UniProtKB/Swiss-Prot annotation:
Keywords: Cell membrane, Membrane, Transmembrane, Transmembrane helix. The gene is ynfC. The chain crosses the membrane at residues 25-47, 78-97. This is Uncharacterized protein YnfC. It comes from Bacillus subtilis (strain 168). Its main location: membrane. It is a multi-pass membrane protein.
């Protein structure tokens, strides 16, 4: 996986400052590690299969073992698929919640900028509100 592309994608996100970008990258990295670890746990391990083939001498026992192993693999794949679906749902919720909060803060910033612009354009600065008296 090319981290340069991922960092470039996250650096193009508008809004917030550097802190928001760092938090987003951190959340995405944690989510990626969680998905990778669950995927690793759902893969059947090949080295166990070879050991069992050597240990079983009878053809019937080998067939039963394969059937049991296939059932275990199927359970693992179903569990892995469910976990992966749950993780993707969490990722979507995380990103939508973050974009909503970013939109809210952006709206607040625009409102604040508008009020300051109106204040600076008003006649407030045209008048002298503070009388300076020289100290004697």
């Amino acid at each position: 996986m090319d981290w340069g592309i991922i960092i470039k994608i996250f650096s193009n996100i508008k809004g917030g400052g550097d802190h928001l970008k760092k938090v987003t990258i951190l959340k995405a990295s944690i989510l990626f590690l969680a998905i990778a670890s669950f995927h690793l746990f759902s893969i059947p391990h090949a080295f166990d299969i070879g050991h069992h083939y050597k240990a079983v001498a009878d053809q019937q026992e080998m067939h039963e073992m394969k059937a049991g192993q296939n059932a275990d693999d199927e359970k693992k794949s179903i569990t892995g698929a469910f976990t992966l679906t749950a993780l993707w749902a969490m990722a979507v919720l995380l990103l939508t919640a973050e974009s909503k909060s970013t939109g809210y803060s952006r709206r607040r910033q625009r409102k604040k900028s508008f009020i300051l612009a109106k204040f600076y354009q008003s006649s407030y600065f045209g008048k002298l509100h503070v009388q300076h008296h020289p100290i004697m």
